[in-house]
């Protein structure tokens, strides 16, 4: 999997422009070193949630080669030491790097496998202050198994705890060619999240007027 991660900020006032700004690149990582930049990235530790219960520090799950960051899922050959049937590699920026507003894009190729669940997503930087799902979750990309579609979704107290998933619609799918590198992105605006793949807009999640709490908690550093 090759990931080129970009953060771009609008050159105009996000309150004044009409969401067609000129973007200014403020940060990128092309993973062209021998190892991921440890001032930005850490390996994700094992955890209880489904997405985290096979995460491993095993070096076999990580590779940097020819400008590629390769995150792998492998069969665990030592279940006496670790009961997980599979081991997977993952990186996050937790406690190291955060951004507020702008566009995030990730270029990646996803190899399919039964049970595979690769994902690219954001959570609030201050996780101790904003417990899930109160601070929201932005799924820039999720893919299942050998699918030729990806999911782009938001989660929050409004969508998850209150179960309001269609007012407004909280996610959408879009076809991809799994054999290609694809660019997955989201634009953070004060009044909406705009999701896109390969520059094509997929869907918009707007902030709406509602008496229910937690509908749009995304105007915080991610």
Task: Give, region by region, the residue ranges found by the protein language model.
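GH16 jelly-roll
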Residues: 18-222
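Bacterial Sec-dependent N-terminal signal peptides
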Residues: 1-21
């Amino acid at each position: 999997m090759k990931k080129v991660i970009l953060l771009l900020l609008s050159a105009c006032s996000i309150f004044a422009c009409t969401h067609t700004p000129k973007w200014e690149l403020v940060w990128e990582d092309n993973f062209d070193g021998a190892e991921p930049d440890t001032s930005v990235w850490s390996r994700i530790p094992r955890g209880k949630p489904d997405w985290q219960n096979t995460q491993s520090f095993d070096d076999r799950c990580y590779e940097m080669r020819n400008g590629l960051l390769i995150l792998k899922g492998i069969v665990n050959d030592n279940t006496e030491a670790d009961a997980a049937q599979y081991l997977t590699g993952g990186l996050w920026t937790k406690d190291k790097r955060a951004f507020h507003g702008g566009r995030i894009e990730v270029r990646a190729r996803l190899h399919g496998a039964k049970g595979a669940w690769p994902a690219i997503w954001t959570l609030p930087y201050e996780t101790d202050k904003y417990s899930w799902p109160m601070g929201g979750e932005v799924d820039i990309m999720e893919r299942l198994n050998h699918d030729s579609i990806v999911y782009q979704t938001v989660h929050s107290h409004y969508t998850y705890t209150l179960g309001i998933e269609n007012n407004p619609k909280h996610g959408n799918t879009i076809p991809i060619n799994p054999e290609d590198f694809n660019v997955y992105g989201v634009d953070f605006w004060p009044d909406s999240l705009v999701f896109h793949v390969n520059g094509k807009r997929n869907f918009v999640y707007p902030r709406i007027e509602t008496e229910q709490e937690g509908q749009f908690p995304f105007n915080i550093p991610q």
